[in-house]
From Swiss-Prot:
GO terms for biological process: signal transduction. Keywords: Acetylation, Phosphoprotein, Repeat, Transducer, WD repeat. InterPro entries: G-protein_beta_WD-40_rep (IPR020472), Gprotein_B (IPR001632), Guanine_nucleotide-bd_bsu (IPR016346), WD40/YVTN_repeat-like_dom_sf (IPR015943), WD40_repeat_CS (IPR019775), WD40_repeat_dom_sf (IPR036322), WD40_rpt (IPR001680). G proteins are composed of 3 units, alpha, beta and gamma. The heterodimer formed by GNB1 and GNG2 interacts with ARHGEF5. The heterodimer formed by GNB1 and GNG2 interacts with GRK2. Forms a complex with GNAO1 and GNG3. Interacts with ARHGEF18 and RASD2. Forms complexes with TAS2R14 and G-proteins; these complexes play a role in the perception of bitterness. Component of the TAS2R14-GNAI1 complex, consisting of TAS2R14, GNAI1, GNB1 and GNG2. Component of the TAS2R14-GNAT3 complex, consisting of TAS2R14, GNAT3, GNB1 and GNG2. The keyword Transmembrane helix does not apply. It comes from Pongo abelii (Sumatran orangutan). The modification N-acetylserine is found at residue 2. This is Guanine nucleotide-binding protein G(I)/G(S)/G(T) subunit beta-1. The modification Phosphoserine is found at residue 2. Phosphorylation at His-266 by NDKB contributes to G protein activation by increasing the high energetic phosphate transfer onto GDP. The keyword Repeat applies. Guanine nucleotide-binding proteins (G proteins) are involved as a modulator or transducer in various transmembrane signaling systems. The beta and gamma chains are required for the GTPase activity, for replacement of GDP by GTP, and for G protein-effector interaction.
Amino acid sequence: MSELDQLRQEAEQLKNQIRDARKACADATLSQITNNIDPVGRIQMRTRRTLRGHLAKIYAMHWGTDSRLLVSASQDGKLIIWDSYTTNKVHAIPLRSSWVMTCAYAPSGNYVACGGLDNICSIYNLKTREGNVRVSRELAGHTGYLSCCRFLDDNQIVTSSGDTTCALWDIETGQQTTTFTGHTGDVMSLSLAPDTRLFVSGACDASAKLWDVREGMCRQTFTGHESDINAICFFPNGNAFATGSDDATCRLFDLRADQELMTYSHDNIICGITSVSFSKSGRLLLAGYDDFNCNVWDALKADRAGVLAGHDDRVSCLGVTDDGMAVATGSWDSFLKIWN
């Protein structure tokens, strides 16, 4: 037996020991604990607005912190800022690269960011003196596509990439201040903790990792999915997070228990998940699927509580407003829909 095989065997044994140790600590399951809680009942949401304006597949969307404005990115090479109350377009920003995969709204509302197959995170200033929107920074440093980005504040942004890394950037200098390495596959998604000191990432190595923003180190690694993790989202209290994967399941992982608490799946759901988001209370988990639907799960009981059906193609992105009053879904059918 070669040294490599021996090491592989040892690693496998260690993994099993860790799994057994975790099992020994888990004295109850979430299902048992939540058994006597009333089910949420049937969730029926209606489409309140349809945002029309993109001419091709929508790949990403992100709400502003005011719960009114949102940004969307499409294959048509446009970044559009929408007023969800009136359905008006506040800005339509032409992009240098139409191969965009992600977009983000800064908490201040002053900036938006986007990126994709150009490997660059482009920052746009919405509040210039002249009133026009222009590129204020292009953050180049990743050697693979940009899959996700999220602002910490007006001068810091975290990005994830197909080069298997995540990075923290100083926008003013345009430099990576921290690189987060450890995944062995393309990093597909990231989510900031409510206090922005930590973030989680999901990758094509089927694992999720918890990172310390300031120290640049991986705190925890979570396994369980059988295929690529496409989407990840923190639980509102910051103690857990949900993932969505090509294995047709969503899962809930707890930071303190250091393991998976729940799987959200159904025999007749056989397609991958593209996006996940929690309701404001955390009781509902919304997930967008390749089969054109968005399923609403009871996060505590893993029952399907509702379906948002209204798109004619894959639901590629979704988001719940900060005030918890509305959900937006974006699709390859080129439309965004606002539900509540």
